[in-house]
Amino acid sequence: VYRNTKQILEYIQSVGYNISIGENLRDGVEVHEAIIANEEDELQYLKKLIDEKDEEVVGILTKTKEHSHFLNSKLTAKENIKIMTINEAQGVEFDVVCLTELSREVFVPSHEDEQLQLEKRRVNKDLIYVALTRAMSELHVVGRESLREIVNKL
C-alpha cells in the first residue's frame, strides 16, 4: 500500500474500504472522480487525460476485455498509455491510473443464485480495490455513478 499517496488512500477509505492509513505517506493530488453519461463522455475524458500525460505511465483499467478492446480501438496509441483489464493489471503499478467502466450493471451481479451472487460481489469489490491501488501518484475514477454507490452495493 505504500506505493500510493495519502490522497489516494484516503479516497479508497472514503468509498467504503476498511484500510488503515500509515504515517509519513507521500503527499499528492486529490483523486479525480468524474460522473459521465455515456461512452462518448468517457472517451472525451480519456482523450483529454492522454493529451496531458507525456512522461507518466498511465494505466487505463477496465473490468471487461470487451471494454478494453473498445478503448484500444478508439484512443490514440502512445507508448506511455496502457489499456488493460483490472485482472491484467494485478501486480503492476502505474504513475497514473484511470479506472473506467464503473456502473452497477458491470460490477453488481443480479439474477443469479444467491450464493454465487455474494461471491461475485466479493470478488468485484476486491477487483476495484486492486485497480485503485495500482496508482502511485494520481488516480482518476470515471463512471456512470459514484464509486461509493457501487462499492456500497457490493
Q: Predicted regions: what is each one?
A:
Residues 1-37:
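Conserved coupling/interface region of RecA-like P-loop/ASCE motor cores
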Residues 7, 69-71, 149-150:
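Phosphate- and divalent-cation-binding pockets in alpha/beta enzyme and binding domains
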Residues 8, 91, 131:
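Hydrophobic, well-ordered secondary-structure elements that form the walls
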Residues 28-31, 79, 93-96, 135-138:
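Short glycine-/polar-rich loops that comprise or flank the Walker A/P-loop
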Residues 36, 84-86, 142-144:
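Conserved beta-strand termini and adjacent loop/short-helix elements that scaffold enzyme active sites
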Residues 40-114, 118, 127:
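Conserved helicase/translocase motor-coupling segment
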Residues 103-154:
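C-terminal accessory regions
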